[in-house]
């Protein structure tokens, strides 16, 4: 299923991953990574806003602009200071690009707008937080992303991904 589309981009995405891994940049300093990603997306005909949302290293690439259904693929590409890509954002960001390239190839059969959004500075300030506060995601039906882990899973019980409500009973102590 879609094997030819997958194979057609494999080498370029692997090169992208290796380039980002070999050139780790910490939050809001992902100039090489964001430029490499944007260059690859544009090479394959994806319209890209760069920089995006008043963030120098953020971008948004759009496939099938103007469709009523809207989906976002999020891409992270920042590194950890002193540790490089120990969190694997070189790989997860590249996989998001891989998905966008394949979906762009299949765009005629997709009745939805698909945006790939580069979300810088995930490790420190949280670039997605600024985007949420600015309403970037308000008009999307869904947003997805991938993150590296030591096993395959559709979902994981992370505090940052789950919603919890706490109710405290008693009298103030101070």
Task: List the model feature ranges, each with a label.
Residues 57, 78-84, 90-91, 110-174:
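Histidine/acidic-residue-rich, glycine-tolerant segments that coordinate divalent metal ions
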């Amino acid at each position: 299923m879609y094997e030819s589309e997958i194979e057609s981009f494999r080498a370029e995405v692997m090169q992208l991953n290796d380039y980002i891994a070999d050139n780790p940049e910490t939050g809001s300093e992902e100039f090489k990574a964001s430029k490499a990603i944007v260059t690859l997306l544009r090479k394959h005909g994806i319209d890209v806003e760069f920089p995006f949302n008043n963030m120098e290293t953020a971008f948004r690439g759009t496939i099938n602009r103007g469709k009523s259904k809207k989906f976002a693929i999020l891409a992270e590409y920042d590194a950890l200071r002193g540790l490089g890509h120990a969190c694997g954002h070189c790989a997860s960001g590249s996989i998001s690009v891989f998905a966008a390239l394949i979906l762009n190839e299949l765009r005629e059969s997709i009745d939805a707008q698909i945006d790939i959004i580069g979300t810088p500075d995930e490790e420190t300030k949280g670039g997605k937080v600024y985007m949420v506060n600015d309403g970037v995601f308000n008009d999307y039906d869904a947003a997805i992303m991938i993150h590296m882990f030591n096993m395959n899973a559709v979902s994981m019980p992370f505090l940052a991904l789950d919603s919890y409500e706490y109710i405290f009973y008693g009298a103030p102590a101070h």
